[in-house]
Amino acid sequence: MENYSDQGGDGIELLDLLFDKNDGILRYENMGQQNNQLWPVQDPHMMMPPQGNEDFFNALIGGSDSVSGSPVWSPSPSDSGISEDPHSDHIDSPPPNASPPMEPHIVVSQTQHSLNINFPFDFNGWETGFLPDQAGGTQCASETPQAQPATGFPLTVKDLLLSGTPETAAKVSQQSYQELILTEDEKRLLAKEGMTLPNQFPLTKYEERILKKIRRKIRNKQSAQESRKKKKEYIDGLESRMAACSAHNHELQRKVFQLEKCNISLMEQLRRLQALVMNGSNKPVQAGTCVLVLLLSFTLILLPNLKPFTDTKVSQHGDFSPMRVQSRSLHNLQSSRVLRNLDHPYSMTENAKILPRFPEDKTMEEIASLLGRLHRRPQFTEYDPESHNHSFDQHDEHHHGDPITGHVATVTLNPRRGSRRSPHADDM
């Protein structure tokens, strides 16, 4: 460290000698990036002498005694929380974004009081670049791997120059060495994968990738859990609705079954009622028909027999009513008697005494007497009984009536005629 402190002034003089715009050796070289081009790169096979390279770094580091405690910066944003100083001036800002990353470049600006140089170094490995030696010449340095500092992060000249301020150094140190807090899920996943992470920042790129991977898995797991939870809630809702619908469906089916049974019973009762109505309507019709037929038959059979074949008499004295006369058989009998009397003539008195009188003869006498009484009445004065009826004494005639038509037939017996057979008339 004493060697570094002794050579601090020589390093500043060396930088002035190299980068002075008026008298500097590299004043004609384009050290910045213009038109998207970097400063020229020499042949990588030209090796820089080891002594000159060591002197160059000793001169750069000699301006500060706190090299080991200088803050480190991460060149790119990450989850470790390391970022560049937000209060840096636009003069100290890095080149435009169009430049290729990880390429070494130098931006030089000179002021009256101080010289700020933004010259990032990648100690993971040098590729190409200009490195001045103590003699003031320019030599090309090829890949010259250097020993990596204890922190494992690249250092810049800006960090080295600003590290002399105690407040800035404390602030950067506080930001750099923050504690890494891991959740239980992150610790469990790290243990499952067999990886470990330090408890404090900064983290390497590999560790940052591991941390990002673990956190991404945790986010995916939480998202999957939320999705499964929502899906489960949705399925539970559907199941509850399906259960309610099933219960309602069973209730409706039960009601339908009851209605079907009621309908079947009503149909059976309707059929029975129809059968009863049909049977009841047929029986009266048949009974009525039979009764009518029987009545008609009895009427047709018994009507002719309702009037008896008996003698009718006058109910009152002086009334006239038709009466029944002798039948055909009796008429023939009387005719035979008349003919027999003609063959053996004798007096009527003797005949009356000898022969018995039939009931018909008595009836005829009664009729004759009745007609005589009618003739005596004043309303029948013009009635001539002689023209209608003749007694046996006068003309020896008999009045006979037809039993079917009721007409009276007149038979006249004339003893003067020589005919043996007496003519008679029949109105049948």
UniProtKB/Swiss-Prot annotation:
Superkingdom to which the source organism belongs: Eukaryota
Keyword Transmembrane helix in record: yes
Matches recorded under SMART domains: BRLZ
Boundaries of every bZIP domain copy: 210-273
Region (Leucine-zipper): 252-273
Compartment(s): Endoplasmic reticulum membrane
One MF term in the entry's GO annotations: DNA-binding transcription factor activity, RNA polymerase II-specific
Listed Pro residues bias regions: 93-103
Main location class: endoplasmic reticulum
InterPro entries, per database record: bZIP (IPR004827), bZIP_sf (IPR046347), CREB_ATF_subfamily (IPR051381)
Annotated site (Cleavage): L330, H331
Lumenal-side segments: 304-428
Stretches in topological domain Cytoplasmic: 1-286
Described function: Transcriptional activator. Binds the cAMP response element (CRE). Activates transcription through box-B element and CRE. Seems to function synergistically with atf6. Regulates FGF21 transcription.
Listed PANTHER family: AGAP001464-PB, CYCLIC AMP-RESPONSIVE ELEMENT-BINDING PROTEIN 3-LIKE PROTEIN 3
Recorded family membership: Belongs to the bZIP family. ATF subfamily.
Assembly and oligomerization: Binds DNA as a dimer.
Protein name: Cyclic AMP-responsive element-binding protein 3-like protein 3-A
